[in-house]
Every structure is written in C-alpha cells, then in structure tokens.
Amino acid sequence: MNAKYLILFNPQSGNKSAKEKVYQLDDILANNELNYVEMTPEFDYKRFMNEVKADERVVLCGGDGTIHRFINEVDEADLSKPVFYFPLGSGNDFNRDVHGKLDNTLINLNNYMNNLPLVNVKGKTKKFINNVSFGIDGWCCEVADKIRQKESSKPINYTSIAVKGALFQYKKTNATVIVDGKEYHYKDVFLASTTKGRFYGGGMMATPDQDRNDPEHKVSVLVFRGKIRLQVLLVFSKIFTGEHIKKPKMCIIHSGKEIKVSFDSPRAVQVDGETELGVTEYTVKA
C-alpha cells in the first residue's frame, strides 16, 4: 500500500536552492502519494502537526534552523507522529553528525527529538538540536545578519568573517563556566560553546567526543582561549577536523548535565544559528 507523505520545505534553505532540490523526493519516494507544502516565515508548525492524520507521514526539508524551529513550535504530543528529515540547508550539521554525509537518505527525526537539552537566554527557554554558543561564532552570526540586511542576495562567507574577527576585530573576554556545580574561570576567551552533537557552524567539529545519544544525555562545553591572535587563528582553523583539542591549554572541554556560562561583557549568542544580541550569560539543562 502506498504511503502518504506531507513534504514541508523551507524555500530559503541552502541559499534558496531548497525550492528546486526538494523535488528529488519524487524519485526517492516514488510510487507514494506526495503533497508538497512550502513553509513561509508565518507558517504555523503547531497547527499543521495537530492536523496530521494517522496514515500520514511528514518529511521536514531544510537546514538546522528549520529543525530548530520545528522542535520548539510543535506540541510535545505531536512529536511522536512519524517525521523524517531531508537535509537541504547550507550547513547541515545535524545530518553530518547522525549520518555523516549529504546524500538522498531520509533520517527518522523521531529518534532524535526526545530528551533534547534546554537553553535559557534572557529568561527565554528553548530546545536546541546542535549547540548554543557565546563568543566569536555568535559575533560572526551577528555580522552575517547585518550583511543580509544590506544585501539579501549576497552569499555569506563565514570563514572570512571569522578570520577577520580572530586577527583584528573580535574583543576577547573573561568567562566563568559552571559544570554540574563545579566552577571554572578563564581569561582571553574567544568562544564558549555547549553542544548536543559534534558539529555546528557548517562542519566545525567543536567537541569530537560528544555523543548526542549519550545514555545520560550529557552535553559538552568547549572553552577556546588564547593570548596571541595569530596562534588563535592557526588553532581555530583545526576545529573542522577536531585537531584543535590537541592544544588543551587553549581548548578546554567539560562534560555535564547543567552548564552555566557567563561573560564579563555583553556578547552575541547563537542557538542553532539564531542570534541573540547583548547577552552576558546562558544556562543549559540536559
């Protein structure tokens, strides 16, 4: 018997390439009944999932930001309905973590939506699928948002932004990190990121040993610090292979279930790529 699939796709994902690539599903799910639904900025995930029938399956198509919005807007009871994920974003870090490569494979999202960590920023609590981060990566997202406001069609070069920040523009800070009640203090901090998976930021393997399927549901927090900016840039460039952890004095990783990160001056925070400005602390409960 043919199955019924409701294909939700974000046309803005993958630098707007998703609206064409989504129709690869015609071949992947051939001989099934497919109904394509375009997700606008005003799209009501909660109402949509409330109305999904027992014989229907949902395919969520987009990037990590699409998953982030989905898990935070849908009623908990509706997250048990059959939901699959088809990666069509520009970073696709969730897919990179659970599947390892970008191909035509559907991922069963139901396996990954339970026991997600919660982050509190400025009194607002959200789930996150990949990470929450203070520091230069949040600053990069802030700069990228400003570029989009001026030139919406211009591709964003995050690597270029990060290089300029590491060498010249980003101002280091002091940080206090509390992990399951134990307090740590760090100077010359560029980054303090708490992760559910290994990857974020379009392939940065920030915490190579983090397991999103950890039976205790622990998360990891990476503190990246350094006094000499050129050395910081050289070590930071190794984050895409995970080799940055070979510099333990600059890259410190803690693991736990309750994390609090505080900076001594306001900075941008990004949660699964969504930016919040003027933040001095965030807390995570796994």
Where are each of the predicted segments found?
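A generic structural signal for short beta-strands and their flanking turns/coil linkers
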Residues: 171-173, 188, 215-221, 257-259
